[in-house]
Amino acid sequence: MKFWMDKGADGWRMDVIASISKDQSFPDYPKTDGRKYYTGKYHSNGPRLHEFIHEMNREVLSKYDCMTVGEAPGSTPEVARLFTDPEREELNMIFTFEHMNIDRIPGSVNRKWELKPFDLRDLKRVMSEWQNKLYNKGWNALYFENHDQPRVISRWGNDTTYREECAKAYATVLHGMQGTPYVYQGEEIGMTNVQFPLEEYEDIEVRNAYQDLVVKNKTISEDDFRKAVWNKSRDNARVPMQWDDSENAGFTTGKPWFRLSDRYQEINVKKALEKNDSVFYYYKDLICLRHEEELLTEGDYQLLLPEDEKIFAYLRTSDKEQWIVVANLSEDTVSTEGLVKYVSDKKDIKIANYKDRTGIKADLRPYEAFMMRIR
């Protein structure tokens, strides 16, 4: 680590860092539900985990101006505080997977390939719990997409009629929270999932699951498995980056390792840069807002309308001011009646994905989102 820090590295993204300590008695996991493989209990969050990370901080990280983020599957907010509380001198932040599992059926023999319908209330509950439990005691790593997750607008939203509105809405929800937002390549132009024949997928996870679940054990049909792959495969986020509408999307003049999305001529960086109200420029505005507005970094968080199935809304509050962040994460037009009571006469729209939004009272159009200063 010292070698790379001395070379000028700015930080570390630590893959599955929660697995560096193991119970040295190496116990067997009890076989209870017919599964052949198990994860988590005996190889993650082991007895000396925090001892090792604190040593890493003491010997290396504390001696450099660097950022650290650890991948910690299975961690709760309580565990996350052990990693990220500044007084413990371990890491700056960790990636949680809890919100990534809301569309997964716990304990299913088909693992993530048995789809559970998206329920916005689950997403709000999990993300709000992390916001509140880490406030002043740690730091959140905020994300919807990465190399292991599909495109959020295809997974939980609308990637056709409202593709751009949906991409901006999810970006608004994420960037209004406390923490460090992570933007994965292509997310900033609204890239979508792909729908290839099963034999064209490169991801070893897909190939192994097909043989195990479809061919051998027959616990899921090929048709249902294909639908799940289209929804959740890691390869959705691993297609080549879409730079322009030329051959191979401008990514390479050679042969890419993986098939390009069929939509690259429609969705690419060149087109995004040519359109003033594109998803790309909306992300730039969000990032500028986070740099300029102290409240987004320091303010506390309060979820509103926790049981609403379409609206994700919350307050951010500091000693000086209060903002409301609102997103209609549905294809329907919905009323803001439940939010009006939180808004005073003083209204200041900070950012909105429908430019004619001026206040709180008008109905929310499909995937409409905004941030507004309310006092």
What is the predicted function of each stretch?
Residues 1-375:
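Active-site and adjacent substrate-binding regions of carbohydrate-active enzymes
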